[in-house]
Amino acid sequence: MTPDLLEAGAVKRQQYQAKVEASNSSGGRAAAFGRVLTPGLPDFAHGVALYLDEVTVSFDGFKALNSLSLTINLGELRCIIGPNGAGKTTMMDVITGKTRPDKGSVTYGQNIDLLRLRENEIAGIGIGRKFQKPTVFEQLTVFENLELAQQADRSPRASLWSRLSGAQLDQIAEILTLIHLLGAAQIQAGLLSHGQKQWLEIGMLLMQSPTLLLLDEPVAGMTDEETERTAELFLSLEGKHSLVVVEHDMAFVDQLTQGCKQVTVLHEGSVLAEGLLSEVQANERVVEVYLGR
Ligand SMILES: Nc1ncnc2c1ncn2[C@@H]1O[C@H](COP(=O)(O)OP(=O)(O)OP(=O)(O)O)[C@@H](O)[C@H]1O
Ligand SMILES: [Mg+2]
C-alpha cells in the first residue's frame, strides 16, 4: 500500500459525500451498489449461477424476449452476440429486475427467484451490471469512486464515522492494479479516458465481489489497445466470477473465447445458436440474420 493511497483512504467522508450529491451521475447509482438484506443466500452447489427458463417480455405486443432459456455456470465467461434489437439488453434488464417478464422464470443459484426481488436487492446478492455508458462519479477521484463502491452502508452517519481498514485499503489497491489505474488513483474520474472510465466502473462493481457480472457492450468506443486490455481483464476474472458479456466486436469475442468457449447468439428474443465462435460464424442462419448483414 503506497503512502498516498493510505492518505487518500483517510479523506473525510463528508467532503466527498457532498460531492457525490452534486455529481452528475444518476441518483440510483449509489443505491445500485448498496448491499441490502435479502430473503436468503443463493445456493450454488450445482455449479449454476443463473438460469433463465422460457422468459418472454412483450412491449405493446412485440416480443423483445421470446421464450428465452439460458444457463450460465459458476465462474463461466459467456459471450452473447446478436444483431441490434435481438433482446440482449432486455435480457440484462430482466436479470437485474429493471424489466419484469410476462412469462418464465429467472433463478439465481438453484434457489433464488430473481423475479421476486427488487433491483437493489438483486444488486445486493451479488449481481453487478455494467451499462454501456460509463457512469462513474466524475467529480470524485478514482480512489474515492472505489471507496464509495466498497461501502456497505452509505448513510451520512456511516460516512462520517467509518475509517478504512487495512483489508479495505488492500482490496482497493488490488482492484486498482487489476484495472490498470494504480497510477491514476488520485486523478478525478472525469479526467480519465473513455476506456479508463469503463475500467473504473468495472472496478467499482468488483469492489462488491459479485458472483455474476453482466457487461453490456463493454468495449464500445474503446481503442484497440484498451479493448485488448479489457479482454485480458475479463479473462483474469473468469473462474472467480461468472461473466455475461454482450458484444458486437467479434475480435474481442474471439479473444475472450480463445477458440474453446461457447458463444450464444440471440435473435428475435430467443437463442438462435450456441457453439464455438467459429461454429456459429459458419452457421447459415446466423450468417443470414447477423453476420451477413
Ligand atoms: N422499453 C421498451 N419499450 C418498447 N420497446 C422496447 C423497449 N426496450 C426494448 N425494446 C425493443 O425490444 C427489442 C430488443 O431491444 P434490446 O435493446 O434488448 O436489443 P439489443 O439486442 O440490446 O440491441 P442492440 O445490439 O442494438 O443493443 C428492440 O426491438 C427494442 O426496440
Ligand atoms: Mg443492447
Q: What are these language model-derived features?
A:
Residues M1-T56, R293:
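ABC-family P-loop ATPase nucleotide-binding domain
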Residues I81-P83:
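The feature captures the beta-strand-to-loop junction immediately N-terminal to the Walker
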